[in-house]
Amino acid sequence: MISAVAGDNFLGGEDFTTVLEQMFLREHEIDEDTLDQKTRAHIHKQAEICKLGFADAKTSVMKCNINGEVVESEIDIDDYEKSCQVLLGRIRKPIERSLKDANIKLKDIEEVILVGGSTKLSIVRRFVSRLFGRLPNTSINPDEVVAVGAATQAAMKERNEAVKEIILTDVCPFTLGTEVVSRR
């Protein structure tokens, strides 16, 4: 049973990539407005590669070719985490809101399962560990669990025999509004 739903629909992996882009541009004193679209796309791709490099390392390198010159930064995970504090704070708010809505205390949570691609980031996992006071369950692929959930929901909508025993009870995650039209 789902007791509460909360989230930030405007927060995701791209936001964490953008932080790396901004760190790189700042370090090399590059004005983003002076870059052409191709160079911006190249920097973005290299920031994404750099972000993925943190999966198994404390530092990651971002190397970009800008106007024929190779510009390189070695970024430390702790510096990256400090630069992501605003984003991590945005993760905290929906967690706190859903716990409050469900009337659940942090100490009552038995297990934390991370869902979605951004939860593979070590800084997100560390943040969640500190918030909940325990390590999250990492035995489930956070991308696959989304796909399995979507497939299960689709099978339920199609009334597939394989999922006939599954019942999903949800809260309404959206605010409801009413419009009144007067013809006077």
Please place each PLM-identified region on the residue numbering.
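Oxyanion-binding/catalytic loops of NTP- or PPi-dependent enzymes
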Residues: 1-184
